[in-house]
């Protein structure tokens, strides 16, 4: 934000055109700021600008609708302006926000692109602000962060999670053809879609075994292991009848530090489960994600320098199955719309950003 503000001031003294000033400031930001980011700023009396880092690691979309009521450009006195906007515009990190506000999704902002909505004219301006931009989104957006009803870079988050569950079930069947799973239970909320499809493919009943207290924040982003561990019991409570006397497969979106998983496995056993198995819709996470996710050090990661047997022992489950990286990438890539297909370069870029490899983009 400070880089952008300073660049706006400097550019404004050089060039009187506000559109060139804004885009010039964004170009400066992209030259100086390395990493994953999506910015959205309201410039008082000027307009709104949204932009995405040159690798498109973090998402941002924009939408439009026909103006309702008085079509006068906001912030401009009627007697001083004859400008009339033809459309209203909105920008957000996910398409679901655009839907709920009654707008239509136009498209994702491209990697290295900026969009400026001029408050005085109502015009929408776009410009590519980085010459070497290439789309390399973080796959964790699809695994964990995004709402299932969102569309990101042409990919339905819901469809991608269904396919994650399908591929996870296929791997379980390959590894344990004679498995004794009685019931599939999701760890709320993000894993629910994947767990539902996994249960369908495995031919086992899907049950809600945990009830979530919605007033507790996401444990993944809480500071400190002790706080996260304590919060699990405050956040979730078991329906004991779904566990008692059964061999249970718990499905989670990912297993990062293992704190939540370990506590949940204990809760399942306390509720009467005979055996507790764990399946992760994401591959083992062995390296920090430096692009805006709270995974600061390798030593926090349960998969770091451990194999699956050691991880299962550490968590306390009978066995654990992780999604294969290639299957995760394919689950997302194959969920893209026909109008916006994903090329192989985009597919391979996932592998760099998903915390499973130690190659970084910036």
Model regions and ranges:
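Short, contiguous acidic/charged loop-to-helix segments that flank catalytic cores in large enzymes
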Residues: 156, 237-239, 250-256, 296-302
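N-terminal segments that mediate ammonia production and transfer
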Residues: 1-191, 199-240, 334-340, 344, ...
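PRPP-dependent phosphoribosyltransferase catalytic core
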Residues: 28-30, 45-47, 52, 79-81, ...
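Long C-terminal interaction/binding lobes of large macromolecular proteins
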Residues: 244
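Extended, hydrophobic alpha-helical segments in both membrane/secreted and soluble proteins
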Residues: 184-187, 191-198, 202, 206, ...
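Short, electropositive, low-hydrophobicity segments enriched in small/polar residues
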Residues: 60, 67, 116, 195, ...
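Gly/Ser/Thr-rich beta-alpha loop segments that engage phosphate groups in nucleotides
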Residues: 54, 58, 260, 294
């Amino acid at each position: 934000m400070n880089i952008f503000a300073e660049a706006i001031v400097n550019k404004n003294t050089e060039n009187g055109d506000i559109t060139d000033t804004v885009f010039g400031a964004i170009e400066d930001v992209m030259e100086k700021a390395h990493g994953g980011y999506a910015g959205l700023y309201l410039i008082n009396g000027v307009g709104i600008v949204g932009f995405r880092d040159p690798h498109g690691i973090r998402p941002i979309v924009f939408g439009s609708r026909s103006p309702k009521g008085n079509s006068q450009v906001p912030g401009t006195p009627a007697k001083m302006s004859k400008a009339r906007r033809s459309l209203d515009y909105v920008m957000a990190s996910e398409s679901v926000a655009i839907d709920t506000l009654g707008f239509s999704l136009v498209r994702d902002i491209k990697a290295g692109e900026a969009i400026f909505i001029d408050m005085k004219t109502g015009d929408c301006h776009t410009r590519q602000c980085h010459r070497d931009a290439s789309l390399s989104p973080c796959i964790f957006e699809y695994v964990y962060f995004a709402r299932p009803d969102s569309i990101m870079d042409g990919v339905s988050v819901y469809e991608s999670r269904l396919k994650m569950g399908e591929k996870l079930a296929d791997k379980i069947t390959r590894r344990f053809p004679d498995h004794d799973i009685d019931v599939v239970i999701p760890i709320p909320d993000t894993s629910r879609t994947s767990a539902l499809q996994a249960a369908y493919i495995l031919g086992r009943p899907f049950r809600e075994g945990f009830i979530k207290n919605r007033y507790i924040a996401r444990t993944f982003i809480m500071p400190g292991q002790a706080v996260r561990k304590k919060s699990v019991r405050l956040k979730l409570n078991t329906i004991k009848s779904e566990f008692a006397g059964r061999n249970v497969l718990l499905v989670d979106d990912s297993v990062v530090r293992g704190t939540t998983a370990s506590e949940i496995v204990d809760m399942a056993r306390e509720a009467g489960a005979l055996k507790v198995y764990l399946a992760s819709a994401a591959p083992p996470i062995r390296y920090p994600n430096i692009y805006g996710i709270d995974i600061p050090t390798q030593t926090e990661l349960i998969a770091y320098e451990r194999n699956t047997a050691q991880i299962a022992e550490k968590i306390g489950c009978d066995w654990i199955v992780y999604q294969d990286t290639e299957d995760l990438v394919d689950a997302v890539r194959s969920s893209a719309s026909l109008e916006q297909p994903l090329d192989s370069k985009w597919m391979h870029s996932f592998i760099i950003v998903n915390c499973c490899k130690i190659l970084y983009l910036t």
